[in-house]
Each structure stands twice: as C-alpha cells, then as structure tokens.
Curated annotation (Swiss-Prot):
ATP binds at residues 38-45. It is an enzyme of class 7 (translocase). Its EC number is 7.6.2.11. It catalyses: ATP + H2O + polyamine-[polyamine-binding protein]Side 1 = ADP + phosphate + polyamineSide 2 + [polyamine-binding protein]Side 1. GO terms for molecular function: ABC-type polyamine transporter activity; ATP binding; ATP hydrolysis activity. The lineage of its organism: Bacteria, Pseudomonadati, Pseudomonadota, Gammaproteobacteria, Legionellales. Belongs to the ABC transporter superfamily. Spermidine/putrescine importer (TC 3.A.1.11.1) family. InterPro entries: AAA+_ATPase, ABC_SmlMolc_Importer, ABC_transporter-like_ATP-bd, ABC_transporter-like_CS, Mo/tungstate-bd_C_term_dom, P-loop_NTPase, PotA-like, Transp-assoc_OB_typ2. It is found in: Cell inner membrane. Pfam families: ABC_tran, TOBE_2. Signal peptide: none annotated. It is a peripheral membrane protein. This is Spermidine/putrescine import ATP-binding protein PotA. One of its GO terms (cellular component) is ATP-binding cassette (ABC) transporter complex.
Length: 364
C-alpha cells in the first residue's frame, strides 16, 4: 500500500474559544490534485495554513513524507503556497520575482537563469521575463506567482483561492492551465475554493468542508452523483429536494407519494416502510414535456412554467408544481428542435427516470 504524501491526523484548531477545525483527518496522495471545497468560514484555508506551517494546530499531527512537521517552520516543509493576493514584489521584474528564492540561497547566476526560464516556460511567460509585474494582467500575475512557487520544485503546492479575482473567461482558461501544469510537473496540488465548478473540473478528489468538519471525500463524480448528505447535495451544483416517506418496498424499489402522485424510486439505501427521506434530483435529470407530447402521465408531475432562462447551450426552466413548490429543470438547447420552444405559463408534465434521483436519510 502506497504511503500518503501528507497525513492529517485528528486536527483541532481554535482561536480562543472559537473552534475552526474539529477532528479533521485526511490523507493526500503523491501527484494528486486535491481540492478543499466549502463555504466561507468553513475552515478550509485554516487547514491549508496548518499544512504550510503558517499556523499551528491546537491538537493533532501533520505528517509530510512520514515525518511529523508540527514543529517545523514553513521554509523547512518543502511546501510552497500561492496566495489569493499573489504577494508579488511590485518593484521587481517578472524574472526577479521568480528568481527571488534562488537569490536568497545564493544560487549561481547561470543556474538561476536556466531555472527561472524553465519555470516561466511552464507558465508561458518566458517572453515577459523583463517586464515589471505591475504591467501585467491579473492572469499573468497569477502565472508569475505560480512560477515563483514551483521554482524549487516543492513536493506540494498549496493554492489559496488563486482564481477568485479573475473574470469568468480567464478563470475558465486558468482552470485548464493549472490542471495541465499539475500533470506536467506530477506535483501534489492542494487547491482551496468555494467554487463548485472549479472543484468539479480540476480535481482528482474533492474534500467537502462545512463548519470545520469534513462532510465527504471523493472523486468529482462521486460527490456530485452520490452526495453523502443534504449539505453536500445542496452545495455541489443545483438540486431539487423533496421530503418523502416510504409507502411500500417492492424488490429493489420503493414507492412514495410526491405532490399526490405515486412514484417509484430505486432503493439505494435499504430503506424500509415509513422511513422519512430526502429525494434529490438534479435539474439536468428532469424532463419537461408539453401536453401534446404526452399520452400516458403515470409517474409524471403536473406543473406550470413560471420562468425561462436561455443560456446558449441550455434552457433553464422554473416549473411550479400543484403545491406551489418551484423546481428547476435544465434542457440542452437545440435551435432545430421545436420541442424546446417553451412558453411562459405553459402547462407541462415533468418526470425523471427511476434511479436518477438520490435518496438520503431525512435530516429534519
């Protein structure tokens, strides 16, 4: 069995009487892109600072390559951090910002030049080496910060919400570049974000945080399609949630009632009659049918379209059910498909196939 590069063992962190992290344990593998995902104030950045050595745990241990590093200062941990603010030296050129750590070590000039240009080439900035960093765009400044962080080839690169200040288009481009850089370097990246799309598109695994606890650890597919609890389901993407009760268990299915309609669902949790559950279905898994398209309405819910949002590749619909509950549906847009020409206030039928839903124990 491969030894993890980083082991977080029962970490607690408090500031005064305020708990920030509560019994957090986590292993990080060699060459892994791991994302710490959660809302503001959940403890994810605090954990990053504990790994880097800028903070000390109140209780628990942190191991890097099998060595406990609790007492080691940041410069002894072979871990580098890219901060949200980039923390560049505004009076220095791109080259000198990247070379700074090497100059502190009194590295020979010839070696500095080679290593700096190697790092700048990886982030596609070699042509801007002599430019002052104040003359760069936000995306270019971020690349400089990354080049400076990888110049010594640390075992772990920690990234604290580095994309949050970029505009949407640049943020999307940088997501792809960061992932490709991580693969090229075969370096362990630990990435902090509150953005679910970033986490899903970049990560090998995602660690979902909430109120100082880890709620779930898994691949992007696992945390999206099989969330561990209601918080994960609601935080990762959009979710329509129905509170239901099991009426009948039949083979591998359960029968329940939603909006007065009897529906069949896959019994994925060995649930029993009278169990209260949350039924979760993603907007992209809901199908919306006009009245003229439907002959048999068994297993469908009647509704009325109350909003239509055109997004280019998709059409998002808000459908009001008979109880007044609003659910979201998302359809891929095809301009040649007349079936996607919905009208406001149109009466429709909505459905999803058994097994497309997620069932979770009721949380009250």
């Amino acid at each position: 069995m491969t030894t993890p590069l980083i082991e977080i063992r029962q970490i607690y962190k408090s500031y005064g009487n305020t708990p920030i992290l509560n019994n957090v344990s986590l292993n990080v593998n060699h060459g892994e892109f791991l994302t710490l995902l959660g809302p503001s104030g959940c403890g994810k950045t605090t954990l990053l600072r504990l790994i880097s050595g800028f903070e000390q745990p109140t209780q628990g241990e942190i191991f890097i390559n099998g060595q406990c590093v609790n007492q080691l200062p940041p410069q002894k941990r072979d871990v580098h951090t890219v901060f949200q603010s980039y923390a560049l030296f505004p009076h220095l050129s791109v080259f000198e910002n990247v070379a700074f750590a090497l100059r502190c070590k009194k590295t020979p000039n010839q070696e500095i030049r080679k290593r700096v240009f190697d790092a700048l080439k990886l982030v596609q900035l070699e042509s801007l080496a002599e430019r002052n960093v104040k003359q760069l765009s936000g995306g270019q400044q971020q690349r400089v910060a990354i080049a400076r962080a990888i110049i010594n080839r640390p075992q772990v690169l920690l990234l604290d919400e580095p994309l949050s200040s970029l505009d949407y288009r640049l943020r999307k481009a940088m997501q792809s570049e960061l992932k490709q850089l991580q693969k090229t370097l075969n370096m362990t990246f630990i990435f902090v974000t509150h953005d679910q799309e970033e986490a899903l598109s970049m990560s090998d695994r995602i660690v979902v945080f909430n109120h100082g606890h880890i709620e779930q650890i898994g691949t992007p597919k696992a945390v999206y399609e099989t969330p561990a609890n209601l918080h994960v389901a609601m935080f990762i993407g959009e979710a329509n949630i129905f509170d239901i009760q099991v009426h009948t268990v039949k083979d591998q299915d359960i029968i329940t009632n939603i909006e007065g309609i009897q529906l069949s669902c896959k019994n994925t949790g060995n649930y029993q009659v009278n169990d209260r559950l949350h039924l979760i279905v993603r907007p992209e898994d809901i199908r919306v049918w006009s009245l003229s398209e439907v002959e048999k309405t068994e297993g469908m819910l009647p509704g009325r379209i109350v909003d239509i949002i055109y997004k280019g590749s998709t059409v998002d619909l808000k459908v009001e059910l008979s109880s007044g509950k609003i659910i979201n549906a998302s359809e891929f847009f095809d301009e040649d498909d007349d079936k996607l020409e919905y009208t406001l206030h149109e009466t429709v039928w909505v459905q999803w196939l058994p097994g497309w839903e997620v069932l979770l124990p009721y949380e009250g």
